[in-house]
Curated annotation (Swiss-Prot):
One GO cellular component, as annotated: chloroplast thylakoid membrane
UniProt entry tagged with the keyword Plastid: yes
Organism encoding this protein: Morus indica
Similarity field: Belongs to the complex I 30 kDa subunit family.
Subunit structure: NDH is composed of at least 16 different subunits, 5 of which are encoded in the nucleus.
Membrane topology, from the record: Peripheral membrane protein
UniProt superkingdom: Eukaryota
Gene that this polypeptide is encoded by: ndhJ
Functional description taken from the UniProt entry: NDH shuttles electrons from NAD(P)H:plastoquinone, via FMN and iron-sulfur (Fe-S) centers, to quinones in the photosynthetic chain and possibly in a chloroplast respiratory chain. The immediate electron acceptor for the enzyme in this species is believed to be plastoquinone. Couples the redox reaction to proton translocation, and thus conserves the redox energy in a proton gradient.
Protein name in the entry: NAD(P)H-quinone oxidoreductase subunit J, chloroplastic
Length: 158
């Protein structure tokens, strides 16, 4: 079953894949990395001007990485928000996804966290660098195939 946004995207010739609805009835769509930036701009113009959250996860050991965007559109009143979940999958070897920082400024720290924890590079992000881990940290701690070091260095806060 396709939701309203999926039908609208098909009507306008925009390539995507419907992933159905989540437990709250929010439509979930898959967008290819190469199509994501242009579709993100179109969604913003269409009224999805609020990026509620962005996160990322490792789909399976050795598999794809996913960047997830929760967008909100308020057309008929604050009590009737229209929400959509967008998933963009990237290959593990070279995970590159266009940054949406220039569309939704709230993506800044969220994309940086996804980079820091999973190693997803967000093309054209103005400050893509580690945000939680030290710059010298090797690896991506939230990947399912990450091997944690058997030591932990405690640094003085001063």
């Amino acid at each position: 079953m396709q939701g309203r946004l999926s039908v609208w995207l098909i009507k306008h010739g925009l390539v995507h894949r419907s992933l159905g609805f989540d437990y709250q009835g929010i439509e979930t769509l898959q967008i290819k990395p190469e199509d994501w930036h242009s579709i993100a701009v179109i969604l913003y113009v269409y009224g999805y001007n609020y990026l509620r959250s962005q996160c990322a996860y490792d789909v399976a050991p050795g598999g794809l990485l996913a960047s997830v965007y929760h967008l909100t559109r308020i057309e008929y009143g604050i009590d009737q928000p229209e929400e959509v979940c967008i998933k963009v999958f990237a290959p593990r070897r070279n995970p590159r996804i266009p940054s949406v920082f220039w569309i939704w400024k709230s993506a800044d720290f969220q994309e940086r966290e996804s980079y820091d924890m999973l190693g997803i590079s967000y093309n054209n992000h103005p400050r893509l660098k580690r945000i939680l881990m030290p710059e010298s940290w090797i690896g991506w701690p939230l990947r399912k195939d990450y091997i944690a070091p058997n030591f932990y260095e405690i640094q003085d806060a001063h």
